[in-house]
Regions:
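Catalytic nucleophile serine of serine hydrolases
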Residues: 85
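Active-site-adjacent substrate-recognition loops and nearby beta-strands
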Residues: 105
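Extended, subdomain-level signal for the structured scaffold at the beginning of enzyme domains
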Residues: 1-77, 81, 89-101, 109-155
Length: 155
């Protein structure tokens, strides 16, 4: 959706190599080519950060020092961040979740609330609190609304 809107997209991974996606957290799906490594990414070079969903990739990002650093850089710089499904997990470990209102995949609701988040059950939620905009959605069914909100936020 971002590319279709004419927005330049950079995909970063912890290794700089392609990212394996999965369907339903168990079936291998396509690989997404990475353009750079998270270690080389700086918030000052981008307008928006999107944290992917899915248990495996979100869990990988939340324990990655460079992934957490980049999320914190975006929030500190007042730049928008989007997170879908299990993606908001990363916000907890980047220490930027507290005080925000957001949605997510239902199973991580307790983790978010324990981190000081106000959780809502909405297709899309835009939270401008704490000096930066956070756009969140619950699951893959919410992708159309999530993608539109991401495009609208930086257009």
């Amino acid at each position: 959706a971002l590319k279709k809107a004419g927005i330049e997209v950079t995909v970063a991974s912890n290794s700089g190599e392609s990212i394996q996606t999965v369907t339903g957290d168990k079936d291998w799906a396509s690989k997404v080519n990475a353009d750079s490594r998270l270690a080389d990414a700086k918030a000052s070079d981008y307008d928006l950060l999107v944290i992917p969903g899915g248990t495996v990739n979100a869990d990988t990002l939340r324990i990655d020092e460079d992934g957490r650093r980049l999320v914190k850089e975006f929030a500190t710089a007042g730049k928008p961040v989007g997170a879908i499904c299990h993606g908001p997990w990363v916000l907890i470990d980047a220490d930027v979740a507290k005080g925000k209102t957001m949605t997510s995949y239902i199973s991580i609701r307790p983790d978010l609330e324990n981190a000081g988040v106000s959780w809502v059950d909405k297709e899309l939620f835009r939270c401008p609190g704490n000096g930066w905009v956070l756009l969140t959605s619950r699951n893959p069914n919410d992708l159309p609304a999530f993608a539109k909100a991401l495009v609208d936020e930086i257009s």
